[in-house]
From Swiss-Prot:
The keyword Acyltransferase applies. GO terms for molecular function: leucyl-tRNA--protein transferase activity. InterPro entries: Acyl_CoA_acyltransferase, Leu/Phe-tRNA_Trfase, Leu/Phe-tRNA_Trfase_C, Leu/Phe-tRNA_Trfase_N. The lineage of its organism: Bacteria, Pseudomonadati, Pseudomonadota, Betaproteobacteria, Burkholderiales. Pfam families: Leu_Phe_trans. This is Leucyl/phenylalanyl-tRNA--protein transferase. Functions in the N-end rule pathway of protein degradation where it conjugates Leu, Phe and, less efficiently, Met from aminoacyl-tRNAs to the N-termini of proteins containing an N-terminal arginine or lysine. SUPFAM superfamilies: Acyl-CoA N-acyltransferases (Nat). Residues 1-21 are annotated as: Disordered. It comes from Leptothrix cholodnii (strain ATCC 51168 / LMG 8142 / SP-6). Belongs to the L/F-transferase family.
């Protein structure tokens, strides 16, 4: 039996993450169930490296996976093809990267994007509402790819201190989500956010430089960064691309 959180308290503590179900169980990383998706509860969870993930009809399920998939932004792999795509994107009229201009739309698109190996979505209506509330409280943000006024890709996640926790992404055009991810990496480099939590290991994330780290190492990093000042200005700064250094798209001329 896994522990249950009370539904009438935002301050009841989570169980120690070492009690999460192990790799040989049917649900590796499952820590506890129950409780509410309030802003206070979500902030408490993310500070500890715990995240909610469940399907329609299930109770709220809380997870602490081991290992944890992490993108250390200094290790981000901007492949040649994506670098070329970025250069073209940045000089084409009507193309934009935005931050937090359409958070609710981003999470809605993420909820409707089919995922290989998943039947339905974990971004159920109460999850959408909870993260929109977290966004309004200043702790959840979206990075968005726009073409001619149309939202064509993006991602959203949670920020606590100097940590960013990626939640989900979508693309309605080729590489649109990768452009948003590159913008997030550039933002993190500019604001001294060293790690982006990716939660689950996938080949796609690994191809971009993400690696699994032991839970103990992940939690030690959280303890160092979650109480540091969070970024205050969540807006797109074109100069942030320079933070990618030689890997970045540079400042191409219109003829590039």
């Amino acid at each position: 039996m896994i522990p249950w959180l009370p539904d009438d308290s935002d301050s009841a503590p989570f169980p120690p993450t070492r009690l999460a179900l192990g790799p040989d169980s049917e649900a590796p990383g499952l820590l506890c169930a129950g409780g509410q998706l309030s802003v206070a509860r979500l902030r408490m969870a993310y500070r500890l490296g715990i995240f909610p993930w469940y399907s329609q009809g299930q109770p709220v399920l809380w997870w602490s996976t081991d290992p944890r998939m992490v993108l250390q932004v200094a290790q981000f792999r901007l492949h040649r093809s994506l670098k070329k795509t970025l250069r073209r994107f940045l000089v084409t009229p009507g193309n934009e990267v935005r931050i937090d201009s359409a958070f609710a739309d981003v999470i809605d698109h993420c909820s409707r994007t089919p995922r290989e190996g998943q039947d339905g979505t974990w971004i159920v209506p109460e999850v959408k509402a909870a993260y929109v509330a977290l966004h309004r409280a200043g702790s959840a943000h979206s990075f968005e790819t726009w073409v001619d006024g149309e939202l064509v890709g993006g991602l959203y996640g949670v920020n606590i201190g100097r940590m960013f926790y990626g939640e989900s992404m979508f693309a309605r055009r080729t590489d649109a989500s990768k452009i948003a991810l590159a913008a997030l990496v550039a933002f993190c480099l500019a604001h001294e956010i060293a790690w982006i939590d990716c939660q689950m290991e996938t080949e796609h994330l690994a191809s971009l430089g993400a690696q699994p780290v032991p839970r103990a190492q992940f939690e030690a990093h959280l303890r160092r960064v979650v109480d540091l000042p969070a970024p205050k200005d969540w807006f797109y700064d074109p100069s942030s691309w320079a933070r990618l250094g030689d890997r970045g798209p540079g400042q191409p001329s219109p003829s590039a």
